[in-house]
Structures are given as structure tokens and as C-alpha cells.
């Protein structure tokens, strides 16, 4: 072989596999193509149906979740409110009984029982009173209403509680309003 023959490309050798060469005619079978088309359309319809079902399920889930959240918000206090009804009933009965009563001690006893009942309901639902009398002032749990000089107490000690604070499951619901000690002037 000469050099020229080696460099001449062979058209049949360079054609990719499965490619149609100039002399060969492609196979054309309409029945096979029609069957492939029908299978592809059936598969596409199946995927479309699945997508529609999934979309409908997601929409239903979204609606159900929104309804559940709304109901949870609406009825979150249902048990607490139900327990408070007994306290309200007790207060109403006490007021009715006090209308003709002149014995203040009986009225006081009834009020104390009602307060005890309320405290039990609050405790049952995680509401805890904060009475920081004598404790160090904590700005996260106390609200200082005033400061008073006091030589007997360390500065920043709660001297008096004007209004108790409350926690709900260890989270501050309302800070205690307090009077805080400070060092006397001149010290």
C-alpha cells in the first residue's frame, strides 16, 4: 500500500454504528411506530393522572392542616376555661350568699376557698405565681417600680412586691412589679 492509500479515509469504516449509509434505506414499520406511540401516550396519561392525584392530595392536606391549626387556636383554652367555670360558679355563689350576710369572716372564708380553687386550676395548667420578696432583683422576671434606700438589705434586693408575677410552663407570663432596695445616700 502506498502512503496515499493509507491516508484516504474509508467512508464505510468511519460511519458510526447504526447509522444509515448512503446506499442503505432505513427500516420504516408504521405498526411498530404506532405501538410505541400508544405506549408512550398511555405512560404519559398515567403520569399525568398520578400528578393530578398528588396535587389533589396536597391540596386536601393543606386544607386539613389549616383547619386543624384553626381548631387548635380556637379551642386551645377549652380545658382551662372549663376548669375556670367552677371558680366563677363559686364566686357567684359567694356573692349571692354575701348579699344578706353581715358576718365578714364567712365572706372571707368563702373568698379564700375560691382563691385556693383558682390557684389549683392555674397550677394544673402550668401557671405559677412569682413572689420574689427578699430575692435579688432580676430584670428578666421583675419590673422595678421604684427604688428605696435601705441600710439593712443589700442593694438590688426586692423589698416589696406590689403585684405578683406569673410563669406559664416556666415562661414569663407577667413580670412581678417590685420595689427594689438601694444603698442609702452617703454610703
From Swiss-Prot:
GO terms for biological process: protein folding. Signal peptide: none annotated. Residues 1-17 have a biased composition (Low complexity). One of its GO terms (molecular function) is adenyl-nucleotide exchange factor activity. The keyword Chaperone applies. The keyword Cytoplasm applies. Residues 1-27 are annotated as: Disordered. Homodimer. Belongs to the GrpE family. This is Protein GrpE. The lineage of its organism: Bacteria, Pseudomonadati, Pseudomonadota, Gammaproteobacteria, Chromatiales. The gene is grpE.
Amino acid at each position: 500500500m502506498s502512503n496515499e492509500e493509507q491516508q484516504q479515509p474509508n467512508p464505510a469504516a468511519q460511519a458510526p454504528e447504526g447509522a444509515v449509509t448512503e446506499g442503505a434505506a432505513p427500516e420504516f414499520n408504521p405498526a411498530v411506530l404506532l405501538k410505541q406511540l400508544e405506549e408512550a401516550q398511555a405512560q404519559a396519561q398515567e403520569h399525568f393522572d398520578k400528578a393530578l392525584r398528588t396535587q389533589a392530595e396536597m391540596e386536601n392536606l393543606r386544607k386539613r392542616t389549616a383547619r386543624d391549626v384553626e381548631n387548635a387556636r380556637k379551642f386551645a383554652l377549652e380545658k382551662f376555661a372549663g376548669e375556670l367555670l367552677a371558680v366563677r360558679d363559686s364566686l357567684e355563689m359567694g356573692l349571692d350568699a354575701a348579699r344578706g350576710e353581715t358576718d365578714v369572716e364567712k365572706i372571707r372564708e368563702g373568698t379564700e376557698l375560691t382563691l385556693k380553687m383558682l390557684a389549683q386550676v392555674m397550677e394544673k395548667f402550668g401557671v405559677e405565681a412569682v413572689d420574689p420578696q427578699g430575692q435579688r432583683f432580676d430584670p428578666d422576671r421583675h419590673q422595678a417600680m421604684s427604688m428605696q434606700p435601705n441600710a439593712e438589705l443589700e442593694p438590688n434586693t426586692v423589698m416589696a412586691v406590689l403585684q405578683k408575677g406569673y410563669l406559664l410552663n416556666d415562661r414569663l407570663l407577667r413580670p412581678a412589679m417590685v420595689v427594689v432596695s438601694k444603698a442609702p445616700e452617703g454610703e
